[in-house]
Every structure is written in structure tokens, then in C-alpha cells.
């Protein structure tokens, strides 16, 4: 019998496929390996199934997006967990997550964790050092990013109400509190929680596998923590598109290929002067643009040597 469904779990070469309320254990045909393809959690598939025997995946549907770490496809939205402390909050890292998700066409949501620990802070905030130790700092960040168009949450209850009917992944810096949050809102996941290493200031990776869980009328999955974020934005137009507020304003720039760095009549730089764009966002745009240019220059030098 041929059926259609979605992979909800992958383990040791076996794939659990949900179809019409039933879950079937399947394996992939060998021809996928020959084609360099591999089914992943989230894939919509066509599979065969016989009574009292495992099924076989016959066809993988086209993916609207996918992640490599972990291997997961067809994601609607992602919750970026950013902690206030241990690890310390970073606007630069937040913007890098946002660039990553915008480029993947995954709707981002921001959840700020460990706000309760701010009361234990004795030092004040220092904008020059980019430290944020007061609740008012995060209220301002929430307001700033909501003006851009992002959803920002301080509590799990409001976050959960946005999960219905969606496939959602949870991601963030290692130790930011992803597992703690997921165990709070979906205790059936029973994820292992790792403490943050005091010596390195980084968390141990505690997420070992990927599996969809039903929650609030949607499907959710955890992802491993990231010590660093690898993104696939390799050119200025893609980077421009990954900053929604810059993309909107850039249409008014005098030059079509404006990089928003040195060109005259740049609408983005004018908006920056008028405080219509966050300085931190613009600085992070410039930093990533510089990294893209450096990577391209390095590649060109290697190619010339080889050629």
C-alpha cells in the first residue's frame, strides 16, 4: 500500500513517518544513497507499507528549507533563545541568528531567558562594552526588535500560544536555556540539561537527537547548541535581504548596487543618522559584510594560485 506522510523521527537508519494519525516505521531505499540524498525529519515522503512489516520510503518531496545541524526540513519558524547571563547576551550573535534564519526563509522569534537572574547583578549596564544587566535594557531591546517586525518574548506562556499549526525549532547559543525552556513547556521530551562550563564560559552540548513532539497544536524540535554559527550568506544582496529594515530602505538608495558603506545619497546611512535604523544592527551588517568580502578575496587568491 502506498501512503504519504511526514517523517517525525530518525534513528539509526529507521524513519518514523506519520500519516493520517498513524506512525509507521520505515527505511530508505538504497537508490537515495546513490543519488546523494537522505531523508530527514520534517520531510514529506511517499512510502510503501505492508501489514506486520516495515515500510520503505519511495520518494522525498521538495523541501522549502532545511538545516544541517540537525538534519531537519520544512521548518515554519524558529525560536532563538538568548540568555541575559551565562552566556552573556550578545546583539551580534542575535543578529547572526536572524541573518541565518532570514536567508533560510524561516520565520524567527526571539525568546530572552534568565531574566530572573538580573536581580542578582550588582554592576550597571555599560553600552560601550555592550553589556546589558538591567531589565530596562531588555525592555528596550524588545521594543527595538519588535519595531523591525520580530516577535520577542519574555515568558513561556506567550511563546507557546504562537506554536499552533506550525513546525518550530528551538535554537540558540549553548547554555542559553533551550533545554530548560523545552522541559518546562514540553516535559514529555525529557531532555538532558547540561550546566555551563565556568572555565570556558560555554555550555556543554546536551542535545543528542532530533525528534518532533506535539505541543499546543504544533510540532516542535530542539537543536544542538551553537558555539559558533555557520551561515550560507555569501554575497551582499543576500545579506541586504537578511536585514528587513535595511532592505526596505535600500530601495531609496541612489545606486542600485549600494553597499551602504561609502556611497553618496545612501538612504540607509541617512536613516542611520536619523535613528531610523539601530546603530548596533548597522554595525553588525558591516561586520558580516566585511567577513563576506574577506572570504571572497581569500577564495580568489587561492584560485589564482591554483590557476
UniProtKB/Swiss-Prot annotation:
GO cellular component, one term: cytoplasm
Principal place of residence: cytoplasm
Cystine connections: none
Gene designation per UniProt: rsgA
NCBIfam families found in the cross-reference section: ribosome small subunit-dependent GTPase A
Function: One of several proteins that assist in the late maturation steps of the functional core of the 30S ribosomal subunit. Helps release RbfA from mature subunits. May play a role in the assembly of ribosomal proteins into the subunit. Circularly permuted GTPase that catalyzes slow GTP hydrolysis, GTPase activity is stimulated by the 30S ribosomal subunit.
Known partners and oligomeric status: Monomer. Associates with 30S ribosomal subunit, binds 16S rRNA.
Cofactor note: Binds 1 zinc ion per subunit.
UniProt keyword Lyase present: no
Listed cofactors: Zn(2+)
Protein name: Small ribosomal subunit biogenesis GTPase RsgA
